[in-house]
Amino acid sequence: KANAFLSDMVDRPIRWMVDDAAKFTAREVRRGRRYDGIFLDPPKFGRGPNGEVWRLEEHLPAMIADCRALLDDKSKFLVLTAYAIRMSALAIGELLNQAMADLGGTVEVGEMAVREEARGLLLPTAIFARWSRS
């Protein structure tokens, strides 16, 4: 929500979700919902209350497919960030390229970093892949 404030978007219709992302996206697909854009920040690993296990490398393709089903020809973006994983930005970008091929647009990938104050070194923090409408 701080990002919405910093981006001067507090008055925009942003729907904030704090839920199991895989269950939420599957539910929204069943309901036939569509979104203008999606920010996706899944964990590397998670365990549900009933012993369910989430592993990013294993479950991300299905989650991206569900997210694709929530977008249509009016949708603007899908942004995915991932931390401390065995997949590269290139691999995640290819997953997005395949999932979003029918919508056109472009996929960009890269690393996120913070600059160390003392020596000015860039310290990697995560990778990202972003699909956007051309």
Where is each model-derived feature located?
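Catalytic metal-binding/acid-base residues of hydrolase active sites
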Residues: 22, 43, 84
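S-adenosyl-L-methionine
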Residues: 1-39
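Short glycine-dipeptide loop
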Residues: 66, 71-78
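Alpha-helical scaffolding segments of alpha/beta enzyme cores, especially the outer helices
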Residues: 2, 23, 62-69
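Mobile active-site "lid"/loop adjacent to the S-adenosyl-L-methionine
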Residues: 18-19, 35-66
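Short, well-ordered secondary-structure micro-motifs
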Residues: 27-29, 49-51, 90-91
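C-terminal catalytic and target-recognition region of SAM-dependent MTase-like enzymes
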Residues: 75-134
